[in-house]
């Protein structure tokens, strides 16, 4: 009889906000071919010749601003989520990070040593991107091949459209939506435009027309932009928001090539002049608060908005360990255990 377990996987974090630890983390993260999709020699040259010479010090300073007594906020929150999910299910729940510790390789080794041979892989990414959901699945399956026999995996697909996820987002945001505000900005992690085109197997839909994300297409199954707009529209409908009171932007871009627009930092400077002086910002692509939400939005974003003439700035926390999000996770696990998962076998990936 199969021995089951759940594996949650999120992005990861440096072990500390020190420059050497941040450099080590960035080398692993940006060395991933699905993150910097360049040829191996070019990726190495860019990393070692430019990025790792300058960015670790700047990033370490940013990490230090959000570091907690429990360490990385992303990892601390992810542990809380794991514990709360484990308390409500009958099978073990493990936690791994795509980069850094606890590593996917080490956690899989522990599960296999414990006799686990049937795993529900739950990437903590609502939307598909080759640099997030896909790289987690690919890494897990690659590491699993090192075991004989390898565990069987069922993979939870991107859940951007699932009612339980949307309901959790709205429930977490409701206390903020009930207070006076002028505008709600959905700030999603950005992606290079080239990543969207590469993910479109048809090569003829994504980013080929102004309204490609609003035109029904099989390409949307792997289109990050279409999926984030679906989430935003579903949230707005569920929360009863007027279309004039919300918009979408993209953060965390790197230099060197076109990224999805509009850029969040540009919008934060523009909105006060457009009369949107009391701003709410929500970051639905992140299930747990992290550097990109806490430092880039809550600290730097607030400063930029207020400097541009804004009056009030509120970042709505990520789902973190919100009860509705835990309910959503439990629902997936229960369905999998019952043999009716809202997910698919990933052996072909």
Q: Where do the PLM segments sit?
A:
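Active-site-proximal alpha-helix that buttresses catalytic centers in soluble enzyme cores
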Residues: 1-349
């Amino acid at each position: 009889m199969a021995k089951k377990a759940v594996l949650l996987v999120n992005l990861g974090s440096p072990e500390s906000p020190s420059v050497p630890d941040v450099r080590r983390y960035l080398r692993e993260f940006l060395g991933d071919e699905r993150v910097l999709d360049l040829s191996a020699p070019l990726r190495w040259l860019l990393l070692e010749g430019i990025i790792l010479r300058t960015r670790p010090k700047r990033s370490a300073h940013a990490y230090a601003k959000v570091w907690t007594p429990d360490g990385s906020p992303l990892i601390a929150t992810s542990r809380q989520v794991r514990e709360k999910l484990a308390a409500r299910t009958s099978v073990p729940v493990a936690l791994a990070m795509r980069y850094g510790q606890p590593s996917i390789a080490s956690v899989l080794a522990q599960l296999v040593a414990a006799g686990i041979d049937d795993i529900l892989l739950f990437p903590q990414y609502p939307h598909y991107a080759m640099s997030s959901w896909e790289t987690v699945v690919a890494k897990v399956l690659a590491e699993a091949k090192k075991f004989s026999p390898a565990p069987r995996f069922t993979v939870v697909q991107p859940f951007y459209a699932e009612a339980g996820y949307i309901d959790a987002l709205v429930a977490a945001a409701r206390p903020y939506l009930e207070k006076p505000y002028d505008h709600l900005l959905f700030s999603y992690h950005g992606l290079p435009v080239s990543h969207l085109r590469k993910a479109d197997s048809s090569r003829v839909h994504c980013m080929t027309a102004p309204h490609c994300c609003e035109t029904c297409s099989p390409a949307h199954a792997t289109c990050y932009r279409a999926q984030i707009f679906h989430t935003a529209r579903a949230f707005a409908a569920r929360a009863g928001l007027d279309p004039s009171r919300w918009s979408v932007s993209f953060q965390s871009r790197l230099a060197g090539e076109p990224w999805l627009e509009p850029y969040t930092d540009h919008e934060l400077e523009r909105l006060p002049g457009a009369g949107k002086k009391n701003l709410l910002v929500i970051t639905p692509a992140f299930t747990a608060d992290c550097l990109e939400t806490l430092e880039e939005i809550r600290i730097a974003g607030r400063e930029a908005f207020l400097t541009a003439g804004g009056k009030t700035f509120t970042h709505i926390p990520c789902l973190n360990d919100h009860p509705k999000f835990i309910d959503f996770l439990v629902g997936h696990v229960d369905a999998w255990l019952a043999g009716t998962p809202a997910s698919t076998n990933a052996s072909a990936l």
